[in-house]
Amino acid sequence: MMYFGYGSNLDWNDWKGYCERNGRSPDGLIEIEPAWILGYNLKFHYHSKGRKGGAADVVPLNHYHATPGALFELDEDTWKTMNMKEGTRGGYYEPKEVLVVRQSGELITALTYVVCEDKIKQQYTKPSPEYEQLIRNGLANRGLPDTGLDHSMNDAWDHHVIEHLFVYGTLMGGEVRHGELSPYIESIEEGSMQGILYDLDYYPGIKTGEGIVHGELIKMNDVESCLTNMDSIEGFYGYESKNSLYQRTIVPIQTKHGLQWAWTYVYSGHVEENTRIDSGRWKQP
C-alpha cells in the first residue's frame, strides 16, 4: 500500500524511535522517492501534547497548490503501526486518499493522514523548534523546498509553494504562443527535465521516460491566473477528467542555479515512436 508522508515521518529516526518504544519493527516503511500531494497545503492548527506544540496537517485548497513530502510503501503490519503512531484510534489523525505526483510527474493515489475535525483549532498553533527541524531536515535531505513550511510557520499557509512553470514548445520565447504567457512572466531562464519529447505536428508533447527535454523555466507573477490560462491553452480540464489533451503535473527542473520544482504539462494521448525528437529540443539552436 502506498503512503504519502509530509511531517515527522520524513525523519527515519523519529519513526524508528517510536517503533522501538512500542515494540514494533520499523522495517516495513520503505521509502520510494520524493513526491507531492496535489491540492493541499501544510498547516499548523492542531496542538500535540506529545510534540509539545503544533503538529502538521495538510488541508485542501485547489489544484493550483501542492505540498512536498515522500512516497512510501507499507506492508499490512506497518499500516497498523502507522495508525498507532498517528493516533487513529484516539481520533487525532485519520487516513485519507489523495492524489500524489511522483518524481517522474506520474500521478497516483495514495493514503496520507489528516487531523480529525474536532481536534482542529481556529488559530495558528506554533510547533516546537525540534518538530519544525524534523520536517525541515526531511525536506532538505530530499531536495524539496521548505517554502510551504515557512509559509505555515508565519500563518500564511494558503500561499503558493510552486511558483514556476516549465515550458518546452510553442509557449517559449520567439514561438507562436509566447504572447499568451508573457504577461505572467516575472523571470525566465533555461532549464531541462527528464522525459521524452515528441513532435505532434504543430506543437510538441512530453511523455515520462528516460531522456532529457530542454525548455524555459518561468517564474510566474500570478500563479492562479497564469495556470488558469495555460490550462485552457493546453486542454487540461482538471485531475478528475479523462479527456484532457495534456495533464498538468510537477517535475524537478535542472537549471544553472540548481534544482527547481515546477508545474509543466505532459501529453495524455498516444504517440508514435518515430515522432520522437532525439535532441529533446523543440526550438533548434
Locate each region found by the language model:
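A glycine-rich, hydrophobic/aromatic-adjacent loop/helix-cap motif
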Residues: 1-285
